[in-house]
């Protein structure tokens, strides 16, 4: 299902001046990301500000996004929550949208189940929603971490097709080694891109691809062609820039860069604040330029 899908953009949700979804900006950005070499998308993830979207907004966003992509690359849509039944119900709605091939389901946050509870949650969602599921393990945001043994157990479930893993390279390597060959493992940490694919992961679910898509595409292609010197050089150049995009609560930094480049993606919704002028200048410095408008989006 995710063969040859190595660069997935966890795409932002553009807003207009009234903080309504800006579908014109979304279409323009989507086409650009495909042009830069993206081979898949996550819509409605963390970077997409899902917690600030209403149910109706999510359905409208996913439907329109699938129309924009028009089958060019696979789409995975966020449906997860800390309510198992609500996750099932929403996944059933989303599976009706043509072009969406799987649901991204995050570990249950706030109520913090134990490992047995997480197994029960994901198995119940996968079976009752009857739709391919990509698990999303991001303990830095959820307050709960799914252990490797739990993930390995869940990887045997037919409808659970993979994981977006936001922990460390040791975990990535363990999961690649101990899950079925058709279970897709993606790092959700941009600076781990080269390390993850070197360990056998499918690729990266990226935020930095909004800005450095050409470079990440070149890095992944260099690995495929066995040019590790080139891949290593690109990763070394990209890592501090990738880290800089998380200096402030995401997706505020990436939106600031895109707005400076006239992509008109708007501000984040509260509780995330847009960057102030001092923060923009600091971000530009960390990205190696004087102003965010100077960031080069082409490679």
Curated annotation (Swiss-Prot):
It is an enzyme of class 4 (lyase). Keywords: Amino-acid biosynthesis, Cytoplasm, Diaminopimelate biosynthesis, Lyase, Lysine biosynthesis, Schiff base. It catalyses: L-aspartate 4-semialdehyde + pyruvate = (2S,4S)-4-hydroxy-2,3,4,5-tetrahydrodipicolinate + H2O + H(+). PROSITE patterns: DHDPS_2. Pyruvate binds at residues 47, 205. The gene is dapA. Homotetramer; dimer of dimers. Its main location: cytoplasm. It is found in: Cytoplasm. This is 4-hydroxy-tetrahydrodipicolinate synthase. The active site is at 136 (proton donor/acceptor), 164 (schiff-base intermediate with substrate). It holds the Pfam family DHDPS. SMART domains: DHDPS (SM01130). Its EC number is 4.3.3.7. Belongs to the DapA family. One of its GO terms (biological process) is lysine biosynthetic process via diaminopimelate.
């Amino acid at each position: 299902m995710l063969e040859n899908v190595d660069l997935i953009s966890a795409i932002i949700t553009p807003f207009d001046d009234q903080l309504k979804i800006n579908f014109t900006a979304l279409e323009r950005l989507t086409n650009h990301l495909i042009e830069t070499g993206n081979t898949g998308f996550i819509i409605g993830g963390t970077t997409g500000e899902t917690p600030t979207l209403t149910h109706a907004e999510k359905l409208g966003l996913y439907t329109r996004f699938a129309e924009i992509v028009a089958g060019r690359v696979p789409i995975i849509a966020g449906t997860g929550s800390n309510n198992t039944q609500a996750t099932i119900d929403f996944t059933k709605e989303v599976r009706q949208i043509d072009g969406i091939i799987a649901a991204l389901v995050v570990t249950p946050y706030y109520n913090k189940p134990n490992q047995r509870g997480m197994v029960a949650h994901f198995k119940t969602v996968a079976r009752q929603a009857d739709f391919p599921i990509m698990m999303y393990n991001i303990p830095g945001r959820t307050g709960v971490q799914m252990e490797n043994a739990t993930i390995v157990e869940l990887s045997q479930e037919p409808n659970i097709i993979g994981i977006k893993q936001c922990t460390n390279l040791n975990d990535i390597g363990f999961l690649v080694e101990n899950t079925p060959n058709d279970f897709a493992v993606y790092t959700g940490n941009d600076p781990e891109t080269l390390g993850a694919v070197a360990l056998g992961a499918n690729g990266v679910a990226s935020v930095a691809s909004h800005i450095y898509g050409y470079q990440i595409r070149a890095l992944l292609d260099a690995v495929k062609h066995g040019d590790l010197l080139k891949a290593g050089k690109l990763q070394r150049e990209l890592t501090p820039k990738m880290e800089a995009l998380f200096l402030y609560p995401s997706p505020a930094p990436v939106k600031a860069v895109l707005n400076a480049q006239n992509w008109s993606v708007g501000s984040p919704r509260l509780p995330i604040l847009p960057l102030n002028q001092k923060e923009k200048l600091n971000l530009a410095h960390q990205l190696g330029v004087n102003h965010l408008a100077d960031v080069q989006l082409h490679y």
